[in-house]
């Protein structure tokens, strides 16, 4: 009878807990994948027309981002 209780406890309690832990890890992995797809140059060029300021990366007058 004790063996049956151990098997039931394993499949009814421990197995669902381990699967729930795996499901909570997936959104973090998706966020990391999405974050890696971002290109810093594209995001800078996207924001410059909105802010309408010259960037601080280049201080020379004939730069591409300030023109």
Swiss-Prot record:
GO molecular function list: ion channel inhibitor activity; toxin activity
UniProt subcellular location: Secreted
Signal peptide: 1-24
Keywords from the UniProt entry: Cleavage on pair of basic residues, Disulfide bond, Neurotoxin, Secreted, Signal, Toxin
Top-rank taxon, per record: Eukaryota
GO cellular component, one term: extracellular region
Matching InterPro entries: Conotoxin
Tissue specificity of this protein: Expressed by the venom duct.
Main location: secreted
Proregion positions: 25-51
Domain free text: The cysteine framework is III (CC-C-C-CC). Classified in the M-1 branch, since 1 residue stands between the fourth and the fifth cysteine residues.
Family: Belongs to the conotoxin M superfamily.
Protein name per UniProt: Conotoxin ArMLKM-01
Organism per entry: Conus arenatus
